[in-house]
């Protein structure tokens, strides 16, 4: 800390100002304000961050000393003002806690009561928010013995005012000789660290990470130092290196990483104007700019900043894990040296952990850097890697060069890992954590810590990739196999499961580069297969899966699966059942590894439908596709059988069906046709809208809730319906719009509740939905087309211009309207309003929300049920939609939209 810094605090000038004023408050406030401005200015100028936070602590020391000296403390040897916690370390960020201990010599402190109260009142009046406790030395010992937080705070203390011997007595009373011996303290701190990490989902890669408390954050470094302090009396990284627990290179890496996080935290406090340790979307762009991350594309600048952030916290996490494991081996070691068991000439087991038999193993036999992970997969009883061996791995990973990568021993070992029955994901994670995977596969190293600035991808690319492999592995075990029965069944019968793991490893490896990441990844995958001398069939399948890993989900979400041509085109693209099986399993794992909230019953049913229909097409033969007329005949025949068995007059059925048109029978299966027909025929004339609600299935993973509406057609039907569903908190995922020749509309919506589940067998909820829709459709003129609702905080930070594409379908008499836009409440209702204004008829819709963006597809016609053929009309429609959506983006209190 500085001894003198007159720009920050001039003691003589301050005391002169105090002498001129009747009240000291104004002088204190002025000094605090000016010091804050000076320090913030220095931060923006790029001053060294450690100096800044120490300077702030030094300034607060001076202010507290001046405040303390305003009062008569009587016997000054019996009371001291002590800084504890982070302030005790001499580290203060703009809004850090200023934790104070007023330490007393004896319990009889009545003589100090008035001065203490007035001192604390003065601190409050001058705007210095402190956390304070008033304790005797004995009380400190009593509370520290019972509370881990108290002993931790007291270990980091400095005397600000009063006698230093008093603090030394407190330190003696709370030393390991009296409480919290190093072993007990270590166990408690290790448990505390694990619980804290679990609070943040045990990952460094949260979208809005906590700089202080999250895994790899500042608290991890502090935990290491607390344990070292209790064991060795060491309180800084440099001293820890002197105890041989840190190499000098590791000390430098930890120090630079800590400095980076300090700068981020300082900027957070400065921008938020309060104590804020969460790196919220609200601040990421401003901090990226403040720290010098610049790019023509602001989104890219944020991604660059966050990638450095994630790499820093990963480095901290790795090193702190290493040090804590080293502590564990030293502090918890028994008197004997532990049991050892040889594994081979290079490795042995030591108390269940694998270790190198000598320090030169990796230098003499570099292939052992891959062998160690294969051994752990082959021996699942191995608990992990000894700390010294982890350090050896880190020290020798520079030996992984092109010669190493092309050595057949190494390529064989890497492929062998993927053929192990268990431990693939666990050991790939270890390889990534120790920096081996990114060295062996440089293309993988590029995606480490790479985050995409959106709400759709909640993990970095490397974490998502390893999560995908984890999900593939879990498909073989209950209860995951029960949740994903088809994927689990297919996974169990894949001829070579190692190929899907390798495809998963490469599927997103092209992210972050210019160009289509699927194409880039396919090129990398081809090179990988060649280098590892995989058979031609294996290589072709891996490359094809990487190139096409998005095709199945895109088809299921954006195409009309009721159209036989869509199924036939997809079957032609896939080519055979083996590829279909691999692609389906990879798609399910990819979605669940991207964002667990993306997987819902409706998405599951779409993929399963596409898989089943494609499999039928492949077995039927691609040269014999099912045509529309054949599908309609099959549906009508099966539905009529159901109705006749239930006693329905076939003549009545034929009369009704004659009004419906071909599209209706293409878009619905026989069971739904029978269900609709029976209800319509029983509906009394002029009884108002018919609203039917049923589950698509009884099993949770099988689909959503189907709402069928039959009513006289009216121009604002779609707009009113979607607005009503918004008010009922329903999320629309699919819409099928049919208008009969008798001008009745037969609309089917697949919906889920806000939590992503189907409505279930809740009679009250079903009645609420039926009554709400019936009332809205009976009196549409009284129903608001748009319902006001605020935009969620996170969505506000992801803004981009809406994209609207209009094109005619060469194979069907419809126009396809594709909309990509920021997710905002009221989007569907706004689109419905545009359709009303342009006299547009909606035939079908596919609704999808991917994080903060919507990707909706509408199949539309003009009022005569013909595709839109006027280019000027299409241009005006496109412009109107964009203007309407931009108006929705500009509004803080935006209307409600059905989200996905």
Swiss-Prot record:
Residues 706-784, 816-900 form the ACT domain. The keyword Nucleus does not apply. It comes from the Bacteria. Residues 461-583 form the HD domain. GO terms for molecular function: [protein-PII] uridylyltransferase activity; phosphoric diester hydrolase activity. Keywords: Hydrolase, Magnesium, Multifunctional enzyme, Nucleotidyltransferase, Repeat, Transferase. Has four distinct domains: an N-terminal nucleotidyltransferase (NT) domain responsible for UTase activity, a central HD domain that encodes UR activity, and two C-terminal ACT domains that seem to have a role in glutamine sensing. This is Bifunctional uridylyltransferase/uridylyl-removing enzyme. It comes from Pseudomonas entomophila (strain L48).
């Amino acid at each position: 800390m500085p001894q003198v810094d007159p720009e920050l605090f001039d003691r003589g000038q301050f005391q002169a100002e105090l002498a001129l004023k009747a009240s000291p408050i104004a002088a204190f406030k002025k000094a605090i304000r000016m010091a804050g401005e000076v320090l913030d200015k220095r931060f923006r100028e790029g001053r060294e961050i450690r100096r800044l936070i120490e300077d702030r602590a030094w300034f607060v020391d001076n202010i507290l000393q001046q405040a303390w000296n305003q009062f008569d403390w009587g016997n000054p040897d019996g009371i001291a003002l002590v800084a504890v916690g982070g302030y005790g370390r001499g580290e203060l960020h703009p809004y850090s806690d200023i934790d104070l201990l007023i330490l007393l010599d004896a319990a009889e402190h009545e003589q100090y009561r008035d001065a203490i109260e007035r001192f604390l009142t003065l601190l409050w009046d001058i705007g210095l928010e402190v956390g304070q406790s008033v304790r005797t030395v004995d009380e400190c010992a009593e509370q520290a013995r019972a509370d881990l937080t108290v002993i931790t705070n007291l270990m980091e203390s400095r005397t600000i005012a009063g006698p230093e011997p008093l603090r030394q007595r407190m330190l003696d009373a709370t030393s390991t000789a009296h409480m919290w011996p190093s072993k007990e303290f270590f166990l408690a701190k290790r448990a505390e660290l694990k619980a804290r990490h679990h609070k943040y989902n045990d990952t460094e890669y949260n979208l809005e990470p906590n700089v202080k408390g999250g895994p790899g954050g500042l608290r991890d470094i502090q935990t290491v130092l607390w344990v070292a302090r209790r064991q060795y009396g060491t309180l800084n990284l440099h001293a820890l290196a002197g105890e041989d627990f840190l190499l000098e290179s590791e000390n430098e890496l930890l120090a630079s990483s800590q400095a980076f996080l300090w700068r981020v935290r300082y900027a957070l406090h400065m921008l938020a104007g309060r104590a804020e340790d969460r790196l919220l979307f609200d601040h990421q762009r401003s901090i990226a700019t403040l720290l010098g991350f610049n790019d023509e594309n602001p989104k890219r600048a944020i991604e660059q900043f966050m990638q450095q952030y994630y790499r820093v916290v990963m480095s901290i996490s790795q090193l702190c894990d290493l040090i804590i494991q080293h502590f564990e081996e030293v502090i918890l070691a028994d008197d004997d040296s532990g049991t050892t068991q040889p594994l081979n000439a290079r490795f042995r087991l030591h108390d269940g952990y694998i270790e190198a038999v000598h320090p030169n193993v990796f230098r003499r036999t570099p292939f052992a850097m891959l062998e160690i992970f294969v051994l752990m997969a082959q021996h699942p009883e191995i608990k992990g890697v000894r700390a010294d061996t982890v350090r050896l791995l880190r020290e020798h990973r520079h030996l992984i060069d092109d010669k190493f990568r092309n050595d057949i021993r190494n390529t064989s070992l890497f492929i062998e890992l993927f053929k192990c029955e268990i431990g693939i994901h666990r050991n790939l994670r270890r390889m990534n954590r120790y920096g081996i995977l990114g060295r062996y596969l440089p293309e993988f190293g590029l995606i480490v810590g790479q985050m995409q600035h959106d709400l759709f991808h909640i993990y970095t690319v490397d974490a998502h990739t390893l999560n995908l492999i984890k999900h593939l592995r879990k498909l073989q075990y209950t209860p995951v196999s029960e949740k994903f029965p088809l994927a689990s069944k297919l996974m169990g019968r894949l001829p070579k499961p190692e190929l899907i793991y390798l495809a998963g490893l490469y599927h997103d490896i092209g992210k972050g580069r210019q160009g289509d990441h699927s194409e880039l990844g396919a090129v990398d995958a081809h090179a990988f297969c060649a280098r590892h001398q995989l058979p031609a069939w294996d290589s072709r399948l891996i490359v094809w899966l990487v190139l096409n890993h998005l095709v199945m989900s895109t088809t299921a979400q954006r195409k009309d699966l009721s159209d036989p041509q869509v199924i036939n085109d997809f079957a032609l693209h896939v080519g055979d059942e083996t590829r279909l099986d691999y692609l389906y399993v990879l798609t399910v794992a990819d979605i669940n590894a991207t964002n667990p909230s993306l997987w819902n019953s409706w998405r599951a049913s779409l993929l399963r439908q596409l898989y089943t229909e494609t499999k039928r097409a492949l077995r039927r033969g691609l040269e014999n596709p099912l045509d529309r007329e054949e599908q309609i005949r099959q549906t009508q025949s099966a539905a009529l059988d159901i109705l006749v068995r239930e006693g329905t007059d076939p003549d009545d059925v034929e009369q009704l069906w004659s009004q419906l048109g071909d599209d209706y029978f293409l878009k619905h299966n026989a069971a739904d046709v029978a269900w609709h027909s029976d209800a319509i025929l029983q509906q009394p004339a002029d009884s108002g809208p018919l609203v039917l609600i049923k589950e698509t299935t009884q099993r949770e993973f099988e689909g959503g809730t189907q709402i069928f509406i039959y009513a006289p057609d009216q121009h604002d039907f779609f707009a009113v319906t979607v607005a009503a569903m918004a008010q009922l908190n329903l999320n629309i995922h699919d819409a099928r719009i049919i208008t009969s020749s008798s001008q009745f509309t037969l609309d089917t919506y697949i919906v889920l509740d806000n939590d992503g589940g189907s409505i279930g067998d809740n009679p009250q909820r079903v009645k609420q939905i039926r009554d709400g829709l019936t009332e809205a459709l009976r009196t549409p003129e009284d129903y608001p087309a748009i319902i006001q609702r605020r935009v969620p905080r996170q969505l506000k930070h992801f803004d981009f211009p809406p994209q609207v594409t209009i094109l005619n379908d060469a194979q069907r008499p419809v126009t396809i309207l594709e909309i990509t836009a920021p997710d905002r409440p009221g989007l569907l209702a706004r689109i419905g309003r545009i359709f009303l204004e342009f006299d547009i008829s909606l035939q079908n819709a596919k609704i999808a929300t991917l994080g903060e963006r919507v990707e909706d597809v509408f199949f539309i016609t003009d009022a005569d049920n013909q595709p839109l053929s006027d280019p000027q009309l299409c241009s005006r429609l496109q412009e109107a939609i964009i203007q309407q959506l931009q108006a929705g983006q500009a509004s803080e209190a935006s209307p409600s939209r059905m989200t996905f």
